[in-house]
């Protein structure tokens, strides 16, 4: 069995903005509830080890060194990109350290991303999409970007779409129209309202009043709300 086939209960996160905040919020909620979590982020912020969060901690320098050497040996000099290499490292390490949930942040896009090798997941989350990495595309239009990020999300799962501008939302809906997954949209299936000292999250399961996130920017409320929605829809 290849390492990727051992990655169970995966949540795949795509988009332009807020992916890291979403991933870390999901991780904190799961761990607070007692679940074991593996997480792969891209890029790292301060140290390369941050990319691989395995069962409660970032990979150590020694384990990272040995992992990189092992995957390099397995690759046997074949052509491979940096992102493909580091994704392969995560899949191998995560397959050896089984968790209750695996959180995967996609790279530049998703359709051809090295993280897009799973055959099933428990959710795909689409964070706010904007113009990014135009140099890697033929035209660099928002249509092309939305296609790359959303057209190949896995079927038979859940797709949670975070707060988007109206133009992007229409394009996302067009791209996932034929996807068999259950679709959950901000402003249709879940909402939030900011108050002075707290905010109210509401969806089909009810509403929750929570303190404001200890992070600057109202967009963080949106990120937290998307994380809550994702977890509440994993039933």
Language-model region placement:
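Hydrophobic anchor at the beta1->P-loop junction of P-loop NTPases
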Residues: 11-13
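Hydrophobic positions on the alpha1 helix immediately C-terminal to the Walker A/P-loop
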Residues: 21-25
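Buried hydrophobic packing segments
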Residues: 26, 30, 87-94, 224-234
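Short glycine/threonine-rich catalytic loop with a Thr-x-Gly-x-Asp
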Residues: 37, 215-227
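A short glycine/serine-rich beta->alpha loop
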Residues: 75-79, 212-218
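Acidic, Mg2+-coordinating active-site environments of NTP-dependent enzymes
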Residues: 97-106, 112, 121-210, 224-235
């Amino acid at each position: 069995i290849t390492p990727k086939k051992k990655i169970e209960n995966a949540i795949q996160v795509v988009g332009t903005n807020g992916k890291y905040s979403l991933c870390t919020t999901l991780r904190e909620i799961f761990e607070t509830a007692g679940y074991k979590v593996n997480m792969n982020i891209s890029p790292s912020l301060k140290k390369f080890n941050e990319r691989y969060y395995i069962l409660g901690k970032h990979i150590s320098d020694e384990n990272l060194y040995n992992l990189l050497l092992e995957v390099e040996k397995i690759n046997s000099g074949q052509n491979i990109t940096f992102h493909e290499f580091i994704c392969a490292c995560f899949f191998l390490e995560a397959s050896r350290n089984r968790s209750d949930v695996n959180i995967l942040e996609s790279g530049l896009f998703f359709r051809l991303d090295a993280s897009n090798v799973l055959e099933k997941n428990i959710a795909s989350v689409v964070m706010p999409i904007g113009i990014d990495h135009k140099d890697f595309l033929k035209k660099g239009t928002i249509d092309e970007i939305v296609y790359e990020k959303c057209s190949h999300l896995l079927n038979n799962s859940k797709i949670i779409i975070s707060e988007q501008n109206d133009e992007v939302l229409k394009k996302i809906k067009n791209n996932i129209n034929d996807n068999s997954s259950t679709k959950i949209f901000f402003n249709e299936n879940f909402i939030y309202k900011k108050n002075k000292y707290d905010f109210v999250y509401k969806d089909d399961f009810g509403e929750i009043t929570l303190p404001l996130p200890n992070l600057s920017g109202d967009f963080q409320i949106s990120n937290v709300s998307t994380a809550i929605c994702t977890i509440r829809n994993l039933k």
